[in-house]
């Protein structure tokens, strides 16, 4: 777990589950509140210090890897302080590890925000060998792909995510600023383009979003196949809202073509809604019912 000023979240996150783990590693990146004291109280251990200045927030993946390397266990359950997992499901974590073929497990990940429930997934359980990467929205998927690993789906684990409801306009702007800077540093890491485009789309700025979504979709990246497919979905919805039937059809045909190319990717396989959405949207487009084409919600 990576923390910074999380004293309010730690008790609801860890009180009922801390004693169920073989080892707990929590990395503090520079808390100014009582976070480290609360960790000591709950976990009977000290947080590891890995200070990150606000201006250098791209180092978060390094903080995760710092923690991974110090864990005395073969498998990692990666949690954030604003996530919750029921104690009984910790036992489920142990049970899924019996699948000797898998290197990781995607789990249900539901975000509760502004009175809405957003269903998504997270690669939350994985072998200790893998490393986190990415300047924003870091994860281990890229390392697992590059090393020929394989992650599968499990229904036995459900993480519930309760993000800070006070996400101000300043924080939203800073988030987009970080994504723009990340694109400059790693221009072929199309995960950043996708998240920037989707952030602009959610804010009601589809014209600005279209540029970044098109860059993602056109990349057809095998390193970021889900992001490229997601970009197709949102682009199709944008074009449908403007009545651009021909462009919608081309976008959906491109999505189906890409899906056939990357369908064997372990993350594409667990995106169970992708193909049904594309096929439904294609049928709606062919009938001229563009009003039926709306992107489903992603967590960002």
Regions found by a protein language model. Give the residues of each.
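Short aromatic/hydrophobic "clamp" motif used to bind/position activated sugar donors
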Residues: 76
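Conserved donor nucleotide-binding strand/loop of the catalytic core
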Residues: 36-62, 66, 70
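Flexible helix-coil transition and linker loops at the boundaries of alpha-helical arrays
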Residues: 182-185, 218-228, 260-271
């Amino acid at each position: 777990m990576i923390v910074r000023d999380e004293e309010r979240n730690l008790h609801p996150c860890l009180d009922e589950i801390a004693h169920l783990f073989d080892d707990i590693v929590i990395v503090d990146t520079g808390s100014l509140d009582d976070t480290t004291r609360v960790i000591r109280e709950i976990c009977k251990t000290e947080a590891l210090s890995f200070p990150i200045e606000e201006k250098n927030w791209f180092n978060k993946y390094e903080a995760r890897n710092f923690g991974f390397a110090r864990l005395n266990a073969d498998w990692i359950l990666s949690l954030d302080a604003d996530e919750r997992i029921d104690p009984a499901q910790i036992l489920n974590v142990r049970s899924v590890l019996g699948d000797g073929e898998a290197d990781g497990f995607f789990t249900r990940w539901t975000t509760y925000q502004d009175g809405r429930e957003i269903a998504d997934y997270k690669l939350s359980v994985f072998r200790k060998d893998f490393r986190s990467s990415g300047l924003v929205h870091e994860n281990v998927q890229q390392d697992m792909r590059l090393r020929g690993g394989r992650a599968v789906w499990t229904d036995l684990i459900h993480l519930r995510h309760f993000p800070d409801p006070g996400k101000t306009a300043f924080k939203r702007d800073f988030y987009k600023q970080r994504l723009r800077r990340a694109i400059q540093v790693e221009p072929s890491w199309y995960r950043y383009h996708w998240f920037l485009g989707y952030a602009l789309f959610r804010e009601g700025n589809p014209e600005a979003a279209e540029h970044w979504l098109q860059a993602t979709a056109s990349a057809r990246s095998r390193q970021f196949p889900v992001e490229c497919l997601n970009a197709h979905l949102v682009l199709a919805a944008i074009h449908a809202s403007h009545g651009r039937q021909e462009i919608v059809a081309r976008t959906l045909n491109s999505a189906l073509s890409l899906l056939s190319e990357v369908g064997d990717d372990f993350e594409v396989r667990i995106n169970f809604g992708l193909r049904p959405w594309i096929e439904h949207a294609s049928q709606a487009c062919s009938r001229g019912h563009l009003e039926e084409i709306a992107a489903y919600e992603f967590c960002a």
